[in-house]
């Protein structure tokens, strides 16, 4: 059933780019575990052991806080249509804000998205596939545009203020890369 790999194969990459949704999990030794759903056109495979994703403004910034302290990250992709499969990428990651060298190196890989907050760069150390037999089937309808519409209405200064007031501390009180 399950198999482990030391890199993202071409077959894995094909599966990943067809998914409309993925999940990001992070934690530190003494924090709550955070799992966040991600969508939109926000993930890129750079090479067999490196992926990046564009982190948009959200109600919290747990991922950035956890990465500052620990760096461990898991990404999970599930097949909600077609053949069942679950694919996990395990590794370490770092968060990079606007105007950083990593941001500048990667932001051009994504379409313009209002509220773009960080580029997350993940070094993939292990890939694991499992059967996905228990994952339900869903019909994909489309991406929601509420987040990008909200960010567009807030404008650049409004988003920056939101980052300072709402995204500078984790739910555990730890600083983020905006703190």
Language model: regions and residue ranges:
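Binding-site signature for planar aromatic cofactors or substrates
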Residues: 1-179
